[in-house]
Amino acid sequence: MRDFIKARSLDIAIGVIFVAVFAALIDIRGDVLFIGFWYYLAVIGGAFVAAVLANPRPFFAGGAVLAAGLSLAVYVWVNSHPDVRSSGLLGIAHLLSLPGAAAGVVALGVVSRRRKWRRESRLFSAGFLGFFLGFVVNQVGLFLV
């Protein structure tokens, strides 16, 4: 267990930073997505768990967690503007895109492990792209249906 935490200390630190940022943001401005603090924890924690399920090398989960945090940040930013009229459904659109993001993270995690990628920048980028591509594909699928 100690080796797991030591090897993934940057990944865990990125997750903790995003949780702290969203906690402060909700405390200061309120929950503009109207979904509760538990959702922010679940998205960031879920991205970390999905990345670790693929058993990749360290730094992969950090990229996935960063992408999850940025996706939430974009949704919070869009919904906090007074010009947006989302009827409170923007959080549901984010929620429905998470299965695709998880599938993308697991798929690229398996690819990175089988290809034996060793460079940290490549692993970090693969985690980020796995979440991002899966999320975007699911978003496009939601809006085409």
Language model regions located:
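Membrane-embedded alpha-helical segments in integral membrane proteins
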Residues: 13-30, 72-80, 138-139
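Interfacial loop-to-transmembrane junctions
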Residues: 113-132
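Alpha-helical transmembrane segments of polytopic membrane proteins
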Residues: 12, 32-47, 89-102
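Short juxtamembrane and helix-loop transition motifs at transmembrane-helix boundaries
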Residues: 1-5, 17-32, 52-59, 83-91
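Canonical alpha-helical transmembrane segments
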Residues: 39-65, 108-110
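Juxtamembrane boundary at the C-terminal end of a transmembrane helix
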Residues: 134-145
